[in-house]
């Protein structure tokens, strides 16, 4: 037996009720039966013409890094951005976000901490004035659709096979690090490329 959501194959996590076998390893995300795929949303993919405005210009090194990120993503490669805290990693990915949206791709930005989700949402909304940027985290789950989705790692379970580009920040931090369930949910949320941001790889 294998859970198609979290990848679990350990027998001790499978239980049987009147509806059949189901996985309890990822039960916090809702009941899913053995052999059952997570619900897939009908996703509208339409080009969104947008531009972003920064509060300060990027340095030549930052511009070069932003261009290289776009280049690798255009070649369908996953990217790791390793830079110190405060180095402007969020600003470095804005060009990639813009170009993805213009092509009609769905973009998600996942991070471990709720407070940072709210902070990133505000920064992205300030930069991309014409986008509907939404935060999906504890206390903010009524609206789950927008032009750009910023969410905690846990909330990725809502987005099975949705994102063409998934930006993942703080992948080295709790609770994502070492959590096999969250890793599988993140894998299933993205049908394209992943862009990892970290200060401590």
Task: Go through each PLM region and give its residues.
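Interdomain "pre-motor" coupling segment immediately N-terminal to P-loop NTPase/helicase cores
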Residues: 1-45
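N-terminal pre-P-loop "Q-motif" helix
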Residues: 54-77
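Walker A/P-loop
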Residues: 74-96
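Short glycine-/polar-rich loops that comprise or flank the Walker A/P-loop
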Residues: 104, 131, 190-193
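Conserved RecA-like ASCE P-loop NTPase motor core of nucleic-acid helicases/translocases
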Residues: 105-113
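Residues immediately C-terminal
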Residues: 113-116, 142, 172-174
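Inter-Walker segment of RecA-like/P-loop motor cores
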Residues: 123-160
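SF2 helicase catalytic motif II
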Residues: 153-197
């Amino acid at each position: 037996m294998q859970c198609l959501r979290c990848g679990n194959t350990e027998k001790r996590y499978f239980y049987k009720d009147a509806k059949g076998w189901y996985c309890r390893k990822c039960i916090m995300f809702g009941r899913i039966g053995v052999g059952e795929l997570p619900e897939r949303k009908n996703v509208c993919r339409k080009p969104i013409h947008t531009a972003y405005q920064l509060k300060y210009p990027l340095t030549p090194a930052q511009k070069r890094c932003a261009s290289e990120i776009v280049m690798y993503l255009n070649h369908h490669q996953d990217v790791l951005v390793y830079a110190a805290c405060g180095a402007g990693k969020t600003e470095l990915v804005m060009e990639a976000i813009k170009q993805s949206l213009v092509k009609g791709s769905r973009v998600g930005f996942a991070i471990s901490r709720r407070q940072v989700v709210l902070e990133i949402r505000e920064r992205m909304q300030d930069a991309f004035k014409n986008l509907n940027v939404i935060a999906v985290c504890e206390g903010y789950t009524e609206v789950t659709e927008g032009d750009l989705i910023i969410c905690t790692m846990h909330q990725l379970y809502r987005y099975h096979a949705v994102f063409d580009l998934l930006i993942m920040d703080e992948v080295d931090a709790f609770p994502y690090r070492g959590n096999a369930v969250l890793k599988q949910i993140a894998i299933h949320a993205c049908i394209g490329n992943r862009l990892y941001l970290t200060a401590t790889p």
